[in-house]
Amino acid sequence: MNSTIWLALALVLVLEGLGPMLYPKAWKKMISAMTNLPDNILRRFGGGLVVAGVVVYYMLRKTIG
C-alpha cells in the first residue's frame, strides 16, 4: 500500500510536469488566465478534480484490490 501511494504521487508529478515541459507558452497563458478567475470558480474546479480523483481511486481499488 505504501509503495502504491508513492507510485501514484510519481505519476501525478510526471503528468503535472508534461505541460510546462512540452508547451511552456500555453501553460503560462493558462496559469495567467486562471489567476483572473473568481475564487468560487477555482474552488468548484478544484473540488471537481478531487471528486474525480476519489472516484477513480475507488474504481481502481475495487478492480485491482
Curated annotation (Swiss-Prot):
Major subcellular location class: membrane
Keywords: Cell membrane, Membrane, Transmembrane, Transmembrane helix
Bilayer topology term: Multi-pass membrane protein
InterPro entries named among the record's database cross-references: DUF2065
Cell compartments where the protein resides: Cell membrane
Source organism superkingdom: Bacteria
A Pfam family of this chain: DUF2065
GO cellular component terms given for this protein: plasma membrane
Segments passing through the bilayer: 4-24, 45-65
Full protein name: Uncharacterized protein YjeT
Gene name per UniProt: yjeT
